[in-house]
Structure formats: structure tokens, C-alpha cells
């Protein structure tokens, strides 16, 4: 087993007593198994300098010198050398030397240096007894060569601070190195503490403690008190301002008599737009003739609805991170914590829905696996983490998405996944070769169909996400054309961009894999984000095929799959948002046609790329429901219900309003709302089921003909069949029928 030295720092002391002469100097090390992303073999060691011979001291000093220029060392260390350095290898020897597995750490406390004392580090183990045995480590920065060297470099650049805007000190190097192999989460209520690979439950607990602490924490000095008073006054004003703006937006949406008159090119409207804050203009707006002008313009109502919503959203954006969290009060006001206890959500459920501040990092993901690469926690724990926090970056998504999409089994080992990757690679190449070596089909209809499929694929791929960097230029190197050779359009140009080519190859191979469905417009929208994250043709193909297992129902020729979802959404809207549902019926929009495209390709065209990654990975978890996209859509309806009900009256207005929402929606807010809506729906469904069970015995004696005839009595469910499917986590799979010459192509 090959070991790497990741970190080395000299002049790290232990202070056994108050006497300076008793201080013990030593080296702080972090070791890690080479070519491994798991931390099962990673250790933190402290070795007293007086226990080392000259050769070992020179080795460690040279390692520390390298560590100055290399943030993370990757210095191979033989097992023999490591055993020599660590001695007996026991946890704690008589000379204070210790070695602790990184896996056993619960938290680390970093105390910054000050005028009177050195900066220090305290390691807290998951075992209290072990923690008591680990000495406090003091970083004597005035003696440490690597710290002195880095400090001089920072001084030369006139930047004495680290990336966290804190004064640089030796402990920062240790924290950076440790953070490269584990996830460190700062406890906001106690900023010196950092949790190591914290569980989601720990993060939630410390988050709640932080809220309580921030409200009760006293000021430390008179000056601090003055500063805090000023901050509180400003905070109070900001909170009040946005609260008033939010209320003003509500009032405006209800009256429909102010902002709607500020549009179009009517002279009165232009005058108002330039002088809308003038007292006399405001008085003029109350004139019945001005009100009549507003009523003559349908688009005024759309403008009014969007303005009211934008003010509320701006208020909420401020309030989400404010001192007393008015955003929370907005949610409570809209959803209700009071009333019918059977269907309203609890404080804990509200807190859980709102706490989306802990995305899963690569370090956290790696910490979930043992030395064989097997998951050490339940799949539900992983999905809970992803559902409530998402994934931190694209590198983490590249590792996790194949699990979420079912390419890798959750219970597989690293060796099993390597074998699976090889098998899937071979199978993909075999499928691809079928169309690469394809001969002309003697059946003219089939040959025409194949050519049409290739034409559709190429056409859609060339138009795909051309604002995204890897798809932007249709050149072999994905760089811009020279100005004198740039084509006017891509329409008459073959695909040259290597990434676009791979999209076309994957879609063509999928045509071989699933000949009954073939290619349907919209599939490129589903494939493009997958390839952007995975960047590997074979793995992307299998992620896409598994994704299409659930999405095929959206592309069936008879449209039965998407129709079922639209019917479920209609029932859901009637149950959860009856006022909006009734108003949409008046607007001839009760079929929710404006939601069709959003559901068809999972909101791909309504949000930017980064937002889509976050939205999709939540959907992939099936944490609450395999059709969670319907609750996300319901959240969009709920969010916009008041502006719609109070300002829009026609089908065209509703369509335009929702089309104009593109790239303007806050996905985080919608995820909070969708979770609260699901909780309320689940409780409502349970309540209706209980009421139905109570009614069955009462009616059982009135008609026994069915029982006597040998059949069970029929009972009508209080919740539709479509709504019942929303409570299931099992993915609904609908396959296309066998394609024939008479099939609609």
C-alpha cells in the first residue's frame, strides 16, 4: 500500500505545563493512501522533534520546504520510512506523540493567534475518551520556516490575509490540507469550530443553535455595542422598507389602479412614467379617466402582475438572509402554521425545507465510502443530503449523477464499478457500430425514416445550447471562425464541434437502442446538460438511457404519458390552489397548457444551466415522489397565484405572463415552496383517506348486494387516481408501442 505525505509543518508545540522550558517542539503531518479518494487510511500525526534522528529531521524539513510552494504535498513515503517516523504507531505514547485516523475526527477548533498567545488547534474525536488524550497543538509561527516564508511573500504582495479574509497563520496551512481530503463545515454560532464530514442531522442541529445564538449573543464592549446599535438600526430600516414594499406590491396587485397605467405610449402614460413620484401626478392617477385608459390596455394588466411579483421577489431576496428572517414569516403567512393541524406543517418541517445551505462536496461524497468503495450510509441519507442541499460543483456531479441515474448500483464496490464501466463501454461501442457500418435498407420506407431521424438529430443538435461554452462554435477546435471565413448560419454547415458531434452520436446510438421511440424533438434538451457534466460519451449515453426510462412517457406518440401528468397537475391545482384553479377556468386556461413545455423537458428552457443542474439532481433523488416535478410546477403556480388572480383575465394574458417568466424565477425559493406543498398534499391525502375509512363502516349495512354476489363493495376514493400516484417513489415507466409503417413519425 503506497502512502503519500500530504502536509508537513515544523515548530508545532505542545505545552504540557505553564513553564516555557517544558514546551515540546514537533512536526504535524497528514498522510493519505496514494490514488485513493477514500479517507479510511488517512491519519494526522504529531511527532516530537527530540524523538527523531538527523536523517528523519532532514527528510521532514525538506518536505516542509516543498510544502511552501505546493499547497498540498503528494510526497510518496515508503511504509518503512513511515514506520520509522511514527515509531510504535500507537495512538498516544509517553512522549506525547500521537496518530489519529482522520475518519475518527468529529470537529477541529482553530484559535487564531493574538498579541499574548500563539494560534492553536484542538482535535475532537468521535470518542470523548480519545479526545481527552489528544494534546492542544500550538503553532509557533515566529519559529516555523514555512510560515515565515509564506508571511514574507504575503507581505511583499501587500496582502497579509488568507482566502477567508483572516490574518494568515500556520494553522491555516493545516486547515487547507485537511480540507483537501475531508469536508470542513464552519459552525457559525461558534466560528472557531469546524465540523469534519458532518452528517446532515449535525448541520441542521448546529444551524438551529446558530439562530438562537445570533439572537442572544451579547456585545463584548462599549464600542461593539455602539456598532451593533447602528447595525440594528440599519437592519430595522431595511427590514421595514422591504416589508412595506412587499405589502405595497400586494395592495397594488389587488387594486390594479396604479402601475398598470405606466405603460404603452399614451401621452398621459409617458408623463406618469417620468413623474410617477410627483404628488400631483399621483393625484391625477386617481382620476376616473386615467383609470379608464389603463383598462383599455390588456398588457397593462400583465405589466402590473409582473411588477407586483418582482417587488415581492426583491423583498424576499433581501429577507432570506436578514437578521430575523422575514422570509420565514412570508412562508408562514402564505402556507400557514396555524389552522387545521392535520394539514399544516410543523416548525421542524418548515426549518428542514428552508435549510438548503449545505451542498454535498467532493470531500463529503468520498467520505461516505469505505476502503473497498462501498457506501457506508443508507441510500436515503445520501438522497436526503442531495435533496436538501444539492451538489457543490460539477466535479461532484460527475461522480454522483451516474448513481442517481442508476448507472452504478448503490451497493457496488469500486472494483465492481470498474468492471461495469468496461462492460458498458463495450456495449455502447457495439451499439454505435451498428449504425456506423449500416448498409442501405432495401425497404424504401424504412430508409426514408432513418434519413429523417438523422436529419432531425443534426438539426436539433446544431441549434442546441449555443450560448454554452462547449457548444458555442461549430468548429473542430470549438474556437471562433476567423472573421473573413465565418459562415452566415449553421444551417448549411455540417457538425464540426467535437462536443456537438458526440451529442449527435449518442442520440443516433439511442435510436438503435430504442428503435420504437427513435428520436423526438426535446431529447437534445435532456441530453445536453448530462453531457456537459459527464464529458464522457459512453457514460453519458448510459446516463441518458436511464434518464429516458422515466422520460419516455413524455414523448409517446399518443401523448398519453404527458397527458397523465397534465391531468395530475390539474387535479393537484384544484386541490391545493382552488382559488387559482377557479380563476384559470375563467381565463380558459384550466387545462394548464402553459405548463406543457416546462414539464416536457423538465424546465430546461425556463432556467439557466446552473439552475437546471440543481433542479434536476433534486428530481433524480425521488426523495418524496418520483413525480416531484409536478410539485415544482405547483410551486410556480402558487408563487404567481396572486398576481394572476388579481390582474389577468384572458388566455393570451396567462400565456404571455408565463412565457415572460423565463430565466426570472428563483429556483431555491421554488424548491422550498414545493417541499411545503408536498407536505401539505401528503397530509391532506392522509386526512381524506382517514375520513373515507370512517365512512365505510357507516355505509356498509345499507347495500349488501355486492357482498352477497361474491364481490367487494365499491367505494369512491376522495383523491383521484392521478393524485394517488404522486405519493409513490417508484418511477413510472411507459414504453412506446412497437413502431410500424403506419406509426406516426
Curated annotation (Swiss-Prot):
Biological processes, Gene Ontology terms: regulation of vacuole fusion, non-autophagic; vesicle-mediated transport
GO cellular component: late endosome
Gene3D superfamilies xref list: putative rabgap domain of human tbc1 domain family member 14 like domains, Ypt/Rab-GAP domain of gyp1p, domain 3
Superkingdom of origin: Eukaryota
Statement: the UniProt record of this protein carries the keyword Cell wall biogenesis/degradation: no
SMART domains: TBC
Coiled coil: none
A Pfam family recorded for this sequence: RabGAP-TBC
Single GO molecular function: GTPase activator activity
All copies of domain Rab-GAP TBC, residue ranges: 391-623
Listed InterPro entries: Rab-GAP-TBC_dom, Rab-GAP_TBC_sf
UniProtKB keywords: GTPase activation
Function (record text): Most effectively accelerate the intrinsic GTPase activity of YPT7. It is also active, but to a lesser extent, on YPT31, YPT32 and YPT1. YPT6 and SEC4.
Protein name: GTPase-activating protein GYP7
Organism: Candida glabrata (strain ATCC 2001 / BCRC 20586 / JCM 3761 / NBRC 0622 / NRRL Y-65 / CBS 138) (Yeast)
Lineage: Eukaryota, Fungi, Dikarya, Ascomycota, Saccharomycotina
Gene that produces this protein: GYP7
Amino acid at each position: 500500500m503506497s502512502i503519500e505525505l500530504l502536509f508537513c509543518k515544523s515548530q508545532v508545540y505542545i505545552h504540557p505545563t505553564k513553564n516555557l522550558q517544558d514546551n515540546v517542539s514537533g512536526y504535524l503531518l497528514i498522510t493519505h493512501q496514494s490514488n485513493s479518494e477514500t479517507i479510511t487510511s488517512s491519519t494526522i500525526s504529531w511527532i516530537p522533534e527530540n524523538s527523531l534522528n538527523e536523517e528523519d529531521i532532514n527528510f521532514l524539513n525538506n518536505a516542509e520546504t516543498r510544502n511552501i510552494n505546493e499547497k498540498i504535498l503528494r510526497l510518496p513515503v515508503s511504509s518503512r520510512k513511515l514506520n520509522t517516523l511514527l515509531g510504535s504507531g500507537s495512538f498516544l505514547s509517553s512522549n506525547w506523540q500521537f496518530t489519529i485516523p482522520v475518519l475518527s475526527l468529529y470537529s477541529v477548533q482553530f484559535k487564531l493567534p493574538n498579541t499574548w498567545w500563539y494560534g492553536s488547534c484542538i482535535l475532537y474525536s468521535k470518542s470523548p475518551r480519545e479526545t481527552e488524550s489528544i494534546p492542544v497543538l500550538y503553532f509557533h509561527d515566529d519559529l516555523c520556516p514555512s510560515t515565515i516564508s509564506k508571511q514574507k511573500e504575503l507581505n511583499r504582495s501587500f496582502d497579509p490575509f488568507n482566502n477567508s479574509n483572516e490574518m494568515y497563520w500556520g494553522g491555516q496551512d493545516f486547515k487547507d490540507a485537511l480540507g483537501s481530503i475531508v469536508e470542513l463545515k464552519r459552525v457559525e454560532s461558534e466560528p472557531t469550530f469546524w465540523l469534519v464530514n458532518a452528517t446532515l442531522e449535525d448541520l441542521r442541529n448546529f444551524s438551529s443553535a446558530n439562530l438562537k445564538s445570533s439572537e442572544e449573543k451579547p456585545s463584548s464592549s462599549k464600542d461593539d455595542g455602539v456598532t451593533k446599535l447602528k447595525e440594528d438600526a440599519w437592519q430595522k430600516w431595511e427590514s421595514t422598507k422591504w416589508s412595506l414594499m412587499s405589502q405595497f406590491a400586494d395592495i397594488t396587485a389587488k387594486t390594479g389602479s396604479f402601475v398598470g397605467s405606466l405603460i404603452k405610449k399614451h401621452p398621459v402614460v409617458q408623463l406618469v412614467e417620468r413623474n410617477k413620484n410627483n404628488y400631483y401626478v399621483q393625484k391625477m392617477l386617481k382620476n376616473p379617466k386615467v383609470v379608464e385608459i389603463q383598462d383599455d390596455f390588456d398588457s397593462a394588466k400583465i405589466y402590473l402582475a409582473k411588477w407586483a411579483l418582482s417587488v415581492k421577489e426583491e423583498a424576499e431576496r433581501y429577507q432570506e438572509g436578514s437578521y430575523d428572517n422575514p422570509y420565514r414569516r412570508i412562508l408562514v403567512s402564505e402556507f400557514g402554521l396555524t389552522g387545521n393541524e392535520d394539514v399544516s406543517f410543523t416548525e421542524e418541517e418548515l426549518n428542514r425545507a428552508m435549510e438548503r445551505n449545505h451542498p454535498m462536496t467532493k470531500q463529503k461524497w468520498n467520505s461516505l465510502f469505505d476502503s473497498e468503495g462501498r457506501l457506508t450510509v443508507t441510500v436515503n441519507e445520501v438522497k436526503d443530503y442531495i435533496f436538501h442541499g444539492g451538489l457543490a460543483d460539477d466535479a461532484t456531479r460527475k461522480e454522483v449523477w451516474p448513481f442517481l441515474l442508476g448507472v452504478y448500483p448503490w451497493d457496488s464496490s469500486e472494483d465492481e464499478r470498474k468492471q461495469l464501466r468496461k462492460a458498458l463501454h463495450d456495449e455502447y461501442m457495439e451499439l454505435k457500430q451498428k449504425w456506423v457500418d449500416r448498409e442501405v435498407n432495401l425497404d424504401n420506407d424504412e430508409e426514408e425514416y432513418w434519413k429523417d431521424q438523422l436529419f432531425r438529430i443534426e438539426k436539433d443538435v446544431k441549434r442546441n445550447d449555443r450560448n454554452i461554452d462547449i457548444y458555442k462554435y461549430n468548429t473542430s477546435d470549438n474556437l471562433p471562425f476567423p472573421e473573413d471565413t465565418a459562415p452566415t448560419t449553421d444551417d448549411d454547415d455540417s457538425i464540426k464541434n467535437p462536443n456537438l458531434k458526440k451529442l449527435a452520436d449518442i442520440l443516433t446510438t439511442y435510436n438503435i437502442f430504442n428503435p420504437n421511440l427513435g428520436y423526438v424533438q426535446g431529447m437534445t434538451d435532456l441530453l445536453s446538460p448530462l453531457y456537459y457534466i459527464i464529458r464522457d460519451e459512453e457514460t453519458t449515453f448510459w446516463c441518458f438511457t436511464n434518464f429516458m426510462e422515466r422520460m419516455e412517457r413524455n414523448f409517446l406518440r399518443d401523448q398519453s404519458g404527458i397527458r397523465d401528468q397534465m391531468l395530475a397537475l390539474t387535479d393537484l391545482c384544484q386541490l391545493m390552489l382552488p382559488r387559482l384553479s377557479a380563476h384559470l377556468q375563467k381565463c380558459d386556461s384550466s387545462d394548464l397548457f402553459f405548463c406543457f413545455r416546462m414539464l416536457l423537458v423538465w424546465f430546461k428552457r425556463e432556467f439557466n444551466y446552473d439552475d437546471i443542474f440543481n433542479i434536476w439532481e433534486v428530481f433524480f433523488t425521488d426523495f418524496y415522489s418520483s413525480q416531484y416535478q409536478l410539485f415544482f410546477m405547483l410551486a410556480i403556480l402558487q408563487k404567481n397565484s396572486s398576481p394572476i388572480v388579481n390582474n389577468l383575465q384572458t388566455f393570451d394574458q396567462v400565456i404571455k405572463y408565463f412565457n415572460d417568466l423565463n430565466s426570472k424565477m428563483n429556483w431555491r425559493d421554488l424548491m422550498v415552496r414545493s417541499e411545503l406543498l408536498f407536505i401539505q398534499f401528503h397530509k391532506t391525502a392522509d386526512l381524506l383517506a382517514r375520513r373515507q375509512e370512517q365512512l365505510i363502516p357507516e355505509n356498509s349495512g345499507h347495500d349488501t348486494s355486492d357482498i352477497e354476489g361474491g364481490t367487494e363493495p365499491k367505494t369512491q376514493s376522495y383523491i383521484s387516481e392521478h393524485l394517488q400516484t404522486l405519493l409513490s417513489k417508484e418511477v413510472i415507466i411507459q414504453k412506446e408501442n412497437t413502431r410500424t409503417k403506419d406509426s406516426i413519425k
